[in-house]
Amino acid sequence: YTTVSQGAHLCAGSHDFNSPNFQLYTKPITIGKNVWICADTFISLGVCIADGVVVGARSLVVKNICQPWTVHAGHPTKQIGKRKETLHD
């Protein structure tokens, strides 16, 4: 399972600002197992988040988080800790 807390925003689309009509483009967001996306976090299009990751409240995720069982926070996010892998089911 994965937990997505209140106010989190997963934005899988954007617009081409060089297009005269701001053409929409999309990329899927992939989130692994045992992930916690904390409150008010923004995750940008095309981002992949590995299993067991925690993303701290009000963080901005614009790049993949590939290292499993880590804790990330900030604008943009950076790794601030690690989790115990034994916590998973």
Model-derived features: positions:
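Flexible, glycine/small-residue-enriched loop-and-beta-strand segment within the central core
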Residues: 1-48, 57, 75-76, 80-88
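Acidic, glycine-centered active-site loop in nucleotide-sugar glycosyltransferases
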Residues: 66-76
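Short acidic capping loops at alpha-helix termini that bridge into adjacent secondary structure
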Residues: 33, 51-52, 68-69
